[in-house]
Swiss-Prot record:
Belongs to the cytochrome c oxidase subunit 3 family. It comes from Streptomyces avermitilis (strain ATCC 31267 / DSM 46492 / JCM 5070 / NBRC 14893 / NCIMB 12804 / NRRL 8165 / MA-4680). Its main location: membrane. It catalyses: 4 Fe(II)-[cytochrome c] + O2 + 8 H(+)(in) = 4 Fe(III)-[cytochrome c] + 2 H2O + 4 H(+)(out). The lineage of its organism: Bacteria, Bacillati, Actinomycetota, Actinomycetes, Kitasatosporales. This is Probable cytochrome c oxidase subunit 3. The chain crosses the membrane at residues 30-50, 72-92, 102-122, 144-164, 182-202. It is an enzyme of class 7 (translocase). GO terms for cellular component: plasma membrane. InterPro entries: Cyt_c/ubiquinol_Oxase_su3, Cyt_c_oxidase-like_su3, Cyt_c_oxidase_su3-like_sf, Cyt_c_oxidase_su3_a-hlx. It comes from the Bacteria.
Length: 206
C-alpha cells in the first residue's frame, strides 16, 4: 500500500501561504482506524483459538469447501481498487475534480463487485455445502470475520458516494473536499490490508 499525504495542495482562498502540516481530520481518522485494527485483531484471535480447539484436520476439511480461485480473483479486484482510490487522491491533491470523480467511481464499482462476489460465495457455500453461520464452528468464524469485513467495505462504498455527491453539489472544489477524499482513502486502504490478512489466513494457511 502506498502512503498517502495528509495535506493537500488545493487552494483554500486565504491570502497567506498554507503550512504543510497534518490535517486534524486525517490524524483523527488514523487514530480511529487504530481502534478498528484492534477489533479485527480480536477476530483473528477468535479464528485461531477455535481452530486450535476443533483441530487442524477438521479445519482443513471445512476449508476445502472454499472456492480459492474465485476468492483470489475477488481479492485481486479489491487490491486493485486500492490503486484506483489512490489515483483519485492524487487527483484531489492537484485539484483535478474530474479525475477524482472518475477514479472514485471506478473504485466504487470494483468495491461493489467485491461485495457481490462475497454474497455469491456465501450463497454457494450455504446451498451446495450446507455451511452456514450456525452449522459448525468453522462456519461461525468464517462468516463473522468475512462478514464484518464486508460491512466495513460497504461503509467505504457509502463514503465514496458521499464524497462524490459533495463534488457534484459544490460550485467549486475546496480544500475540505480534498481532505475528505484523503480520509476516505485511509479507510479504503485499511479495509484492503485487513482483507489481505483475512484471505491469507482463511484461504491459504492450511
Amino acid at each position: 500500500m502506498s502512503v498517502v499525504a495528509t495535506a493537500t495542495t488545493v487552494e483554500t482562498g486565504h491570502a497567506h501561504p498554507s503550512v504543510n502540516r497534518p490535517n486534524l481530520t486525517s490524524v483523527g481518522t488514523i487514530i480511529w482506524l487504530s481502534s478498528e485494527l484492534m477489533f479485527f485483531a480480536a477476530l483473528f484471535a477468535m479464528y485461531f483459538t477455535l481452530r486450535s480447539v476443533t483441530g487442524p484436520e477438521h479445519w482443513k476439511e471445512m476449508a476445502s469447501h472454499l472456492n480459492f480461485p474465485f476468492s483470489a480473483t475477488n481479492t485481486t479486484i479489491l487490491v486493485l481498487s486500492s490503486l484506483t482510490c489512490q489515483l483519485g487522491v492524487f487527483a484531489a491533491e492537484r485539484g483535478d475534480v474530474k479525475k477524482l470523480r472518475m477514479w472514485f467511481i471506478v473504485t466504487f464499482i470494483m468495491g461493489a463487485i467485491f461485495i457481490g462476489g462475497q454474497v455469491f460465495e456465501y450463497t454457494e457455500l450455504v446451498k451446495k455445502d450446507g455451511l452456514s453461520l450456525s452449522s459448525d464452528p468453522y462456519g461461525s468464524v468464517f462468516y463473522l470475520t468475512t462478514g464484518f469485513h464486508g460491512l466495513h467495505v460497504t461503509g467505504g462504498l457509502i463514503a465514496f458516494l458521499l464524497v462524490l455527491g459533495r463534488t457534484y453539489a459544490a460550485r467549486r472544489f475546496t480544500h475540505e473536499q480534498a481532505t475528505a477524499a484523503i480520509v476516505v482513502s485511509y479507510y479504503w486502504h485499511f479495509v484492503d490490508v485487513v482483507w489481505i490478512g483475512l484471505f491469507a489466513t482463511i484461504y491459504m494457511i492450511k
